[in-house]
């Protein structure tokens, strides 16, 4: 029986999926799998028997990915499970940035006890006037699970939509509205659009991509939205751009001491994925991926090892090997198995950067000698006997 430990409260829509082969444990030291949302694992001592970590959400900055990979711990996330929630809040952000709705609501609260509140509203509402989004040019950097559907919704709202994503998948491209105009570089987006939103992962090359240089290339009075990652935007440069009027409004889902006190910034309390539907979807996806890996050895939506799926084992035995991506490894694995007079019924080998994963279905249950032989091969991190 597999032991599962939660580091955060997980939706019952997900926890109800565990079968009788899984049991919850309060002791992380005994856990085969950990499921979490936002808990920080960087300072945790990872137990030696831990096999997998599933993040009920997309971001994995709270998980030590390389450390996990080196220990043979597969880390999963749930891309797309919260995409609709984030996309809808981004649409809301466009409206909040284009019309001073928040300022108007706050003003009404300040005069709510005045008996002439209705007259005051009619007299003072003009100070909160804004602009329609229909007809405006929307630039979307990143056309994945959030950016793609956002582009399609914005088109239906009458916006001119421009998208930039050099890594767009074939599926995402096929699903994109035919009227979305493709831009080759973010710089083309900067020069063209009235509203700009970023939907890219936080990587070394994307950190502070919205900086002083990028802002200087944008239209005066541009509205910028960030519902992806806090550090995609240089806060110091943004504060200067808001003060000068270069940026009319900055809407972010990531408040910090700088943005929470930044004039012209609307800081939303990280509500992008905070819907019941999103939390349910993420939990279901995380649990299913965890169960499939622990029971069958299949890897789907890992962020530190390659995806590799051979379905449910139909043979008498299955071995999986987490290893470093060293040339010739597969040959050494098959030779080790053949030396024990074991026939391979099927195999799959995938690599991802420095790491690789091999699944081997065998004609009979592997012996302890076969397993030990595999463990001794250079670069092997972990060997599991699934069946």
Predicted regions, residues:
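An N-terminal-biased, well-structured beta-alpha scaffold segment characteristic
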Residues: 1-79, 211, 216, 223, ...
């Amino acid at each position: 029986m597999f032991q599962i430990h939660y580091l955060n409260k997980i939706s019952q829509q997900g926890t109800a999926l565990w079968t009788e082969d899984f049991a919850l444990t309060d002791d992380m030291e005994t856990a085969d799998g950990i499921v979490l949302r936002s808990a920080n694992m960087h300072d945790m001592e990872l137990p030696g028997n831990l096999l997998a970590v599933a993040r009920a959400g997309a971001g994995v900055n709270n998980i030590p990915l390389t450390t996990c990979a080196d220990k043979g711990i597969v880390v999963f996330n749930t891309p797309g499970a919260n995409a609709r929630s984030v996309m809808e809040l981004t649409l809301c952000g466009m409206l909040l940035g284009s019309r001073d709705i928040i300022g108007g609501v706050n003003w009404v609260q300040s005069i709510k006890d005045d008996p002439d509140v209705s007259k005051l509203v009619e007299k003072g509402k003009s100070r909160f006037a804004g602009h329609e989004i229909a007809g405006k040019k929307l630039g979307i950097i990143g056309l994945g699970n959030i950016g793609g559907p956002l582009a399609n919704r914005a088109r239906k709202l009458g916006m001119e939509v421009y998208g930039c994503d050099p890594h767009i998948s074939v599926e995402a491209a096929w699903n994109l509205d035919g009227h979305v105009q493709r831009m080759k570089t973010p710089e083309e987006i900067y020069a063209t659009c009235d509203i700009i939103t970023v939907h890219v992962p936080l990587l070394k090359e994307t950190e502070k991509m919205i900086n002083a240089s990028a802002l200087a290339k944008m239209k005066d009075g541009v509205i910028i939205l960030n519902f992806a990652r806090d550090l995609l935007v240089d806060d110091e440069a943004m504060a200067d751009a808001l003060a000068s009027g270069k940026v009319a409004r900055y809407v972010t889902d990531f408040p910090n001491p700088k943005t929470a006190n930044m004039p012209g910034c609307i800081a939303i309390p990280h509500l992008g994925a905070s819907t019941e539907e999103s939390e349910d979807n993420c939990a279901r996806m995380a649990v299913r991926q965890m169960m499939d890996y622990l029971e069958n050895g299949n890897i789907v939506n890992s962020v530190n090892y390659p995806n590799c799926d051979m379905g449910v084992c139909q043979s008498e035995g299955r071995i999986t090997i987490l290893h470093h991506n060293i040339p010739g490894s597969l040959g050494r694995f098959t030779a080790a198995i053949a030396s024990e007079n074991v026939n391979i019924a099927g195999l799959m080998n995938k690599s991802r950067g420095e790491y690789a994963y091999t699944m081997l279905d065998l004609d009979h249950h592997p012996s302890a000698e076969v397993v030990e032989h595999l463990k001794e091969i250079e670069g092997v991190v972990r060997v599991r006997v699934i069946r």
